[in-house]
Amino acid sequence: MIPPDNYIIFLKFSEQRWIDSLVNGNFSFSCVGKFIQQAQATGDTVQGDSFKGYFARLKKDDKRLTIMRSRLKDDLEESNDGNYVLLRRKSALTVPIFCIYGYQCIDAVNEAPSSGKTRIRHNFDARLFDAFANKWNSSIVADDRRATYVILQARAFANRIAEMRDKELKNMLKKQRRERKALANRVLADRIQYDIDERGEFFINPTDNYPELLHKRCEYAYQYETRIYFPDIHLSHIFDRKSVAVSAFDKSCLL
């Protein structure tokens, strides 16, 4: 029996230069702050989303507001939203993240797959391609910046993430010995939960794992996003990137 949370494929849609880099084993991590700025500057609500990173939408008299103000201090960002207050950590905006479309067995069938062969047909939502491709191809001429995509074999992708974890752990241990202090450099990966209703009340406990980075609005469920991120690292600027090199994907890994 195949576990329902096993992945079937991974798809990455981006500029040609970033796809080429990924196939060569170079993962480029951006951050939520960049996507928020992109949404505000261009109106792109597919890749950009100004609602990203919020961990709570609470009524103004909610006692948890006082608790969060005391706990997070200057890291807390508050935005009025009618009778509610939206809460976001400033530090969440610069956590390095890598986003990819991940299709799981549970997505293909209503219940866990049984033994034997199963034929799966999956139609990618047109919004994935239309919004990205129209924006890039209509405004950018350079070939390496045109929109394209790659579909990766699930096991091969998972192996690269395991390799990334090993590499980052070794780098952290070396730095820890050099600086003689305890350090952390975790590589976390999980599927996005599309459970945020922007008109309702919600609260995600803001721990050091930055769980708010794994929640998005319900309307984005068609993106089937899996996110890899470094909760212990922060980029110096929202337009900076963190790069991690692992083994390249050979032709057998590309679907």
What do the PLM-derived regions correspond to, one by one?
Residues 1-255:
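NAD-dependent ADP-ribosyltransferases
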